[in-house]
Amino acid sequence: MESTFLQDNMFFIIAAIVSGGMLLFPMISRSAAKEINVQQAIKLINYENALVLDVRDDGEFAEGHLPNSKHIPVERINDRLQEIEKYKDNPIVIIFRPGLRAGHAASVLRKNGFNKVYNLSGGIDFWKRDNMPIVRK
């Protein structure tokens, strides 16, 4: 019985396609916002009136957040855009816990006309690591 290359190697071909997709997904999901470090975020907050948008869930936010940050969990960002509409022309620094939440939040903001969207590289973990101020609720 003769078989073709594709039939003999179907498992490896599927594994290669899935692996490639997994490698590309983080790059695609983060492309909506520029990543900035803690020092760059501080400059935007202090000198350009940036809105700090915390997209973590309620429990994570209560454990500690940046002073004067606006809390909108990523799951509710579409429903609550009107709350931040006045900041469309300001930089927005997204605070998150590492994962895909920041990429999703940035995509929603960009699609709705927010052009200066930034993700804090490392999220809240890097902010804490650098001993920056945290407010606890």
Question: Which ranges hold each PLM region?
Answer:
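Rhodanese-like catalytic fold shared by cysteine-dependent sulfurtransferases
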Residues: 1-44, 50, 58-91, 101-137
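N-terminal glycine-rich beta->alpha transition that marks the start or flank
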Residues: 54
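Short hydrophobic segments within beta-strands
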Residues: 95-97
